[in-house]
């Protein structure tokens, strides 16, 4: 009996070692194929993009989005937000007259149609002056209304022809319109389930095997689970021919609610003359090394 037990134990240990060696080889193959890289926010300025930020409530989606603003406003001077309820996090980041409250399907469709018309007029004016205008539409927690919005689907599929980029903040991939998923350029995961990621990537054009991407995504999420980490998968165009998964985190100033006044000043709005009143209504602290120069920009 002791010899039989010893033999069984030896066999069990042998199989365990083989199992871990196989998995270690698999991990090494994936790591050798795909690289984890710091996300280059400047790449978002190269061409129109369609980004999806997916994660549960409190996962850090909005804070990360706000961290992108200091980069995005270099190109996108017209930023519009669509949200069902007032969110104070956007105070000081988007002009109040560019925030659309859409509590119903009809309200979303109506406001998007109006916005599209205004974008077309603005582009025509800019072309007459031999200039270019770029637009960014943000949809925060709009839910199932996104998947049923025909105008949004048009923007996802053809928005690049209107110099328009799209950012969707969703708690689940199900809220991303099925007819627009093939045109998503950036998928940002905030600790979502692998099954949700798999469903999202099914339609998205990516470089490399989706199975390897999902394994790499799972490894990064598991290894860095204590951080509010954005794991970003780019499409086959934005990845610049590389097999890579990018990671990024929110900026410290944004987390600490230190507002950079230049973010608002860089955007176009008829409300610029009311900037001081708008800033006084927020409870954030200004983080601006040269407030006097910014004030001159406002008056000009």
Swiss-Prot record:
Which Pfam families does this UniProt record tie to the protein?
Pox_A32
Q: Which InterPro entries match?
A: A32L (IPR006758), P-loop_NTPase (IPR027417)
Subunit structure as annotated in this protein's UniProt entry: Interacts with protein OPG137.
Q: What does this protein do?
A: Participates in viral DNA packaging and virion morphogenesis.
The text of the family note is:
Belongs to the orthopoxvirus OPG160 protein family.
Q: What is this protein called?
A: DNA packaging protein OPG160
Protein source organism: Monkeypox virus
């Amino acid at each position: 009996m002791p010899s039989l037990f010893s033999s069984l134990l030896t066999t069990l240990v042998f199989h365990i070692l083989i199992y871990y060696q196989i998995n270690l080889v698999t991990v090494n193959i994936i790591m050798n194929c795909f690289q984890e890289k710091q996300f280059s926010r400047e790449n978002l300025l190269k061409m129109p993009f369609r980004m999806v930020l997916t994660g549960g409530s409190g996962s850090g989606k909005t804070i990360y989005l706000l961290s992108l603003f200091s980069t995005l406003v270099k190109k996108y001077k017209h930023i519009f937000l669509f949200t069902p309820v007032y969110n104070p996090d956007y105070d000081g980041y988007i002009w109040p007259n560019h925030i659309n409250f859409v509590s119903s399907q009809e309200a979303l469709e109506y406001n998007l149609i109006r916005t599209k018309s205004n974008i077309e007029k603005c582009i025509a004016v800019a072309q007459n002056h031999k200039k270019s205008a770029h637009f960014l539409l943000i949809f925060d927690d709009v839910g199932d209304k996104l998947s049923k919005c025909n105008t949004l689907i048009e923007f996802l599929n053809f928005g690049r022809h209107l110099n328009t980029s799209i950012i969707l903040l969703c708690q689940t991939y199900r809220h991303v319109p099925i007819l627009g998923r093939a045109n998503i350029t950036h998928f940002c995961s905030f600790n979502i389930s692998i099954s949700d990621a798999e469903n999202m990537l099914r339609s998205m054009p990516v470089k490399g095997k989706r199975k390897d991407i999902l394994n790499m995504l799972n490894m990064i999420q598991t290894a860095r689970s204590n951080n509010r980490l954005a794991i970003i998968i780019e499409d086959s165009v934005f990845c610049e021919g590389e097999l890579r998964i990018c990671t990024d985190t929110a900026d410290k100033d944004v987390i600490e609610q230190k507002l950079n006044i230049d973010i608002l000043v860089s955007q176009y709005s008829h409300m610029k003359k009311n900037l001081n009143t708008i800033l006084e209504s927020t409870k954030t602290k200004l983080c601006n090394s040269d407030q006097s120069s910014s004030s001159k920009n406002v008056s000009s």
